[in-house]
Amino acid sequence: ADASGHGLLAALLVRDVYVGLRMGIGGDLKIARAVERLNRILNKSRLATKFVSLFYGEFEANGEIIYVNAGHPGPLHLHARTRSFTELESTGMVLGPSPNAPYTRRAVKMEPGDLLLLYTDGIVEAHDQRGREFGLDRVRRILLDYRKRSARETAEKLLSAVREFSPGRPAEDDRTVVVIRRTGRLRQSNAPAPLAPAPPSIAAS
């Protein structure tokens, strides 16, 4: 989740989002309905900053991810077999502005070796001394170069690359990445699926 604005109010708002979402999911609400309920709560909030982008996903043992993307920058799914990318686009608007905004859930399947990157816009919008943005193309190149490295190494490389790109410039927005890699060997197209796939490995910075 990423809240509009900066400082303590934004941090408190993100904390409240996490708490509210856990309460909704813990109450056996479907994830789309839980996000809709959370959106209504935020809409009624008196906080000065109350616009929040959110990506919420549930990871299944077979590699499937069930998710809702409420206006968050689209996570990048790197397919190990084809070395191609799929962007997980929004399934609803940011939380807060509209109390009756609808949200839908979608699913994506991660095969062994696949990688998923979640990031805040402070990553791609980081500027160098000439005013150029870091951009998604640089992010994709790093993911391809590090596609066989661990999730932690990939996350650390992304963050260090952004810092090197913007030396001496204070971050204008939050810079956070989460890298999720599904472990296990990449299967041949005609090979049977393993009965118990290894769980994803996760690194966050």
What are these regions (language model features)?
Residues A1-S4, L8-L9, L13-V14, Y18-S205:
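Conserved subregion of the PPM/PP2C metallophosphatase catalytic domain
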